[in-house]
């Protein structure tokens, strides 16, 4: 299992799993986009590169997901595949997907923001939890 949805009053969250830190970040991104759209309907037609940095792993997770959410909102993109490289607290990621097409993409939730509320990134246990404002 790559990720699962978490119940949270008034908001929504995901619990992501990964054997490596990079996989944890990739699966968190997939989990976030699964809240937005059915990932099975998204084709990897284009690719964007994302670079973020932070002071700690939790901040790195928020910055990574928030940057992807920014691209979703401003460029009307949805993503289905993610590759991440992390060195220290610098992340370089690639997200593959396509422009939103109302004929093939039924949008689910409007995720407004990535929050620090109950945020957890635990690479030793291979789990991360993220709550989103909707």
Predicted regions, residues:
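N-terminal intrinsically disordered, cationic/polar leader segments
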Residues: 1-134
